[in-house]
């Protein structure tokens, strides 16, 4: 008599097949493989794909090759304006600290003589996170919330933060040159920079900017008509907003990929920063004697 055939799936040699294990977790058996590379993957490593499952490494490699969406100004498209929220939080923290330690305003507010003669350069930026009262805080905070939400989405996180910092520094720079003996606090320089930038970028997008223009004119009127307001910080910030906003919105001319656009924006923002540094360091020697301040 002949021998019956072996059961289906059994080895003729009597050996049991070696079970496959996940390539990332050697202690986990699996019967599923990545449909892209063929490596075995356990349930924790399975990423659902249009056909079957992919492993984490193939998914990561695919994400690196996908072009990220960008705005018309070259910034990455964002979901949340995290920089705006962070700045609002820092401004709020600064105000709370002022209530606990009132001497903070004198120690960290903008004072041109203290900056240039005393070497307290940190005042150029720390002054932007301090305020003269609750209404001052609420106005600047509300303006930052509205303008920041729009600008950060248009420009992206990096460009928006650059605009804010250069606006604050420009307001402090003009205060140092024209009113070095005056102590000033507030984010108004940076806020006026946002006004200038939102006008330029909004026009570039073809939006109706008449309401922004009206608000800007009203605030400029308040700047010069209401006493004890640092017009130097407002004007310095506004100039920065128009200049930096124009860099981001109008340059480079013509069509450009995001790498070339980013390079141009970085170089132009760096050039503006260098100009600002020259004014801060060398400006007082020329301006203060002309104004009779020394």
Specify the residue positions occupied by each region the protein language model found:
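Residue-level signature of the transmembrane alpha-helical core
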Residues: 92, 125, 165-169, 190, ...
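C-terminal transmembrane module of polytopic alpha-helical membrane proteins
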Residues: 1-76, 224-294
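Membrane-helix interface "capping/anchor" motifs
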Residues: 152-159, 200-210
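Alpha-helical transmembrane segments that form the membrane-embedded catalytic/substrate-binding core
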Residues: 137-144, 185-197, 230-248
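N-terminal TM1-TM2 helical hairpin plus the immediately adjacent luminal interfacial "cap"
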Residues: 73, 79-187, 227-229
